[in-house]
């Protein structure tokens, strides 16, 4: 059996990540959130989903893993710092930033399960 090329593995992982993000966005929308941005990139970092419900802004990191525990532990301290830095930049560009409260969430996407939303995860 021939091994997959690295490019093929990367593409599969990228596709799996995008599907997980869309599943997470659907989960959040059904909870009453409005998706403001997906894959928001800055020079400081990236936020998978920025969702808003009223004056609450949720900066969401999406992880597709085999288990909930694996997904939570996959969000490292470095990733948390990058997400916080990117969210500060996003907030500074909002006209009503003084009214907004920010929360950092994780949505764990596991096989054959509904995505699990973990509010205020870090």
From Swiss-Prot:
SUPFAM superfamilies: Restriction endonuclease-like. It comes from the Bacteria. Pfam families: UPF0102. GO terms for molecular function: nucleic acid binding. PANTHER family: UPF0102 PROTEIN YRAN (PTHR34039:SF1). Belongs to the UPF0102 family. NCBIfam families: PRK12497.1-5. This is UPF0102 protein R00337. It comes from Rhizobium meliloti (strain 1021). The lineage of its organism: Bacteria, Pseudomonadati, Pseudomonadota, Alphaproteobacteria, Hyphomicrobiales.
